[in-house]
Amino acid sequence: MSMFCYQCQEAAGGRGCTVKGVCGKTEDIAKTQDLIIYVVKGIAIYSSQVREIGLNTSEADKFIVESLFSTITNANFDAKALNARVQEGLKIRQSLKDAIIKAGGSYNSKENKSWTSKFLSVLGIKNDKDEKEIHDAAAWAANNPEDFKKKAETVGILATENEDIRSLRELLTYGLKGMAAYLEHANNLGYDEDSIHAFMEKALVATLDDTLSADELTALVLECGKYGVDVMALLDKANTSTYGNPEITKVNIGVRNNPGILISGHDLKDMEELLKQTEGTGVDVYTHSEMLPANYYPAFKKYKHFVGNYGNAWWKQNEEFEAFNGPILMTTNCIVTPKASYKDRMYTTGVTGFEGVKHINASKDGKKDFSEIIEHAKRCSSPKEIEKGEIIGGFAHNQVLALAPQVVDAVKTGAIKRFFVMAGCDGRMKSRNYYTDFAKALPKDTVILTAGCAKYKYNKLDLGDINGIPRVLDAGQCNDSYSLAVIALKLKEVFELEDINELPISYNIAWYEQKAVIVLLALLHLGVKNIHLGPTLPAFLSPNVAKILVENFGIGTISSVDKDIKMFMN
């Protein structure tokens, strides 16, 4: 069976990648990632039961989160690392099974009826005759890459034959992947929430349950949105408690003459460690793409060698990494297949990886030694200037709510007629230029609220301000879409409205990968309707599942700039 992947917006032909991923992943990588998801589901079968009888699940929790994150689009292309993850997962699964037995429980209901009946029901075990047959995800075993390869042939997306059930299972899985990404960042800062792990396990096991109806899976998808809000709130708390609340900041986009390190991705803990370790070395630090919002946090402003932001969204990295001249640290997705001209200057860390690229692991205490990349930087030329000037950002919920009287007054007087939430992702497709044209064409009495790398389509345009309020308010990274929700809920309260949809806010969101999926599900949970997704609707939505989203939530897509602006403004 050939590979099949349709988890990102650029899925080939709007249907799915079957030969090689548009992202660059090979068939082997794609299938190994399928197997990792299968292993994680098997672990969830046991860890949910270990959790139920009160035993420690921290090792399994960490593995599930990191494994889901490692399969996000453009995160990890290292076959050796991915196969090692499969091997580690099988060991963790066995340790959970052993823990159940040691505690006097059983994974077989014949030995212990008291707490395994629920366990068996979610596995699709329908009668006593089948009770000895634990789901294959919890039972299969292998110990080498060749056996993994054979197993991977049988567990891909298309193993679920019913199109609608498959669609709902994948929608749920992609929501979990986005959730895992945000939870991993919070965990790195010492913040966690057991209920989120418990839901992830429940949802993973549910994707194996052939007895669940489409309605039951739909309910789980919507519940996923509830935990999406929870995980974004947790990460917001982790980030702001550790580094302070983002504040209005002018960010330099030019360069200096010192050698530099370019840090990309989302992990602020890595950002902190790099800034600490480069201080006093003569090496400057620049952010790239989704790391731009690090410039908004007070804790990072004390570092004089933190210069600003270099470049644009992730998909332009081939040219921009080449021009940077110094080493690049990828803390998370998005990785584009590196050019030979800079591959030896590229480093990965965390769940990311690319074959032939140096990887920096954390020690047992979670610390990372960046000395190698720092010494590498010292041997490199300073970055080539590709832009100059400044951009402004830092409009997360705390900062915007501090401006609430000014914003509310502008709305009441009619100076601001409408807000447009244009959060989300950027990508390669030329059709995404729609978002630049849309921003340019918006009436002058409108304000864009953004988060995520979608901002790069318009954050360098001169769109002016309204009574001193910039017409583009950048809250931060994609997870900071949470800030936009907090702002909307506060405005609902201020204007004493019954329904969040009564606010003069329209949602025109550009999506790309699985973190955008959890953001969407979170917005749906909060009751937001009439969200428009583009540049295309997800390939993983079957016609019937898409119909559910359209009929119940008013989900739509984009058409032309003029038609859409007219529709939104009316």
UniProtKB/Swiss-Prot annotation:
The protein's Enzyme Commission number: 1.7.99.1
**Can you say what this protein is called?**
Hydroxylamine reductase
User: InterPro entries this protein is in?
Assistant: HCP/CODH, Hydroxylam_reduct, Prismane-like_a/b-sand, Prismane-like_sf, Prismane_a-bundle
GO: which molecular function terms?
Answer: 4 iron, 4 sulfur cluster binding; hydroxylamine reductase activity; metal ion binding; peroxidase activity
Q: What does this protein do?
A: Catalyzes the reduction of hydroxylamine to form NH(3) and H(2)O.
Where does it primarily localize?
A: cytoplasm
Residues holding hybrid [4Fe-2O-2S] cluster: H266, E290, C334, C425, C453, C478, E513, K515
Classification via SUPFAM superfamilies: Prismane protein-like
Broadest EC class?
oxidoreductase
Give me the comment on cofactor binding.
Binds 1 [4Fe-4S] cluster.
Name the UniProt key words of this record, in alphabetical order. Answer: 4Fe-4S, Cytoplasm, Iron, Iron-sulfur, Metal-binding, Oxidoreductase
Similarity section:
Belongs to the HCP family.
Chemical reaction(s) catalysed: A + NH4(+) + H2O = hydroxylamine + AH2 + H(+)
Q: Name one GO cellular component term.
A: cytoplasm
Q: Which gene encodes it?
A: hcp
Looking up Gene3D superfamilies in the UniProt record yields: 1.20.1270.20, 3.40.50.2030
Q: Which residues carry this modification: Cysteine persulfide?
A: C425
Q: Does the keyword Metal-binding apply?
A: yes
Residues holding [4Fe-4S] cluster: C5, C8, C17, C23
State its cofactor.
[4Fe-4S] cluster; hybrid [4Fe-2O-2S] cluster
Q: Which GO terms describe its biological process?
A: response to hydrogen peroxide
Report the subcellular localization: Cytoplasm
Disulfide partners: none
